[in-house]
């Protein structure tokens, strides 16, 4: 799992050198993006997607809320477009491209840099904002296919519930190489296994027999 600061609430800003940045700061769920109308004042990736027409302002979150397009445009204009001498749409596009590049670099960490060819894989776009970025990311990373699952906004929570519980333990033994006592080493492994079994039993979500 590689984590990066590029989610729907990641804040876009211009640094002291005049470069457009996205993240690592986030507006979170509250106040959230400016377009949520909950008091947010700094433009986010979600605001940029809205400005570019990738989100329907009148049907968001299954129609449970509407988005403030005017507020999103004004926030991007003030924080990004004017300082950079860009149009609002141009600044919004830059925000999205920077976010996409960060995600592509993260993909390369777990693919190319580990000896895997991205062309052999499918990109699954999930998360609240994932589907809005998946195709462009796949193009840049050289991934030939994209899958958007049903209910992508709940995929992470579902994965948490169904994934295997994994725990790691370690122990340090300091001995001379000519004084290694294998029964002592075996005893440490047994102790670690017992501790792992107890931790597994204590985990509320754990079920089944542990494997070591």
Per-range role (PLM):
Residues 1-212:
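N-terminally biased helix-coil "hinge/interface" segments that flank
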């Amino acid at each position: 799992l590689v984590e990066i600061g590029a989610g729907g609430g990641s804040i876009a800003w211009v640094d002291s050198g005049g470069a457009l940045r996205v993240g690592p700061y986030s507006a979170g769920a509250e106040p959230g993006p400016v377009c949520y109308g909950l008091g947010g004042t700094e433009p986010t990736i979600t605001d940029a997607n809205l400005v570019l027409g990738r989100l329907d302002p009148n049907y968001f979150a299954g129609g449970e809320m509407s988005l403030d397009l005017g507020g999103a445009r004004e926030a991007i204009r003030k924080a990004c477009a004017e300082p950079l001498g860009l149009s609002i749409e141009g600044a919004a596009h830059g925000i999205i491209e920077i976010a996409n590049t960060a995600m592509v670099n993260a993909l390369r960490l777990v693919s190319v840099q580990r000896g895997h060819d991205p062309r052999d894989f499918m990109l699954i776009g999930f998360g609240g904002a994932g589907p809005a970025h998946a195709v462009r990311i796949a193009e840049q990373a050289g991934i030939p296919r994209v899958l958007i699952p049903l209910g992508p906004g709940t995929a992470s929570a579902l994965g948490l519930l169904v994934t295997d519980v994994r725990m790691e333990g370690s122990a340090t033994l300091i001995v001379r190489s000519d004084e290694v006592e294998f029964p002592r080493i075996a005893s440490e492994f047994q102790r670690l296994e017992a501790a792992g079994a107890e931790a597994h039993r204590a985990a509320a979500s754990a079920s089944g027999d542990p494997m070591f």
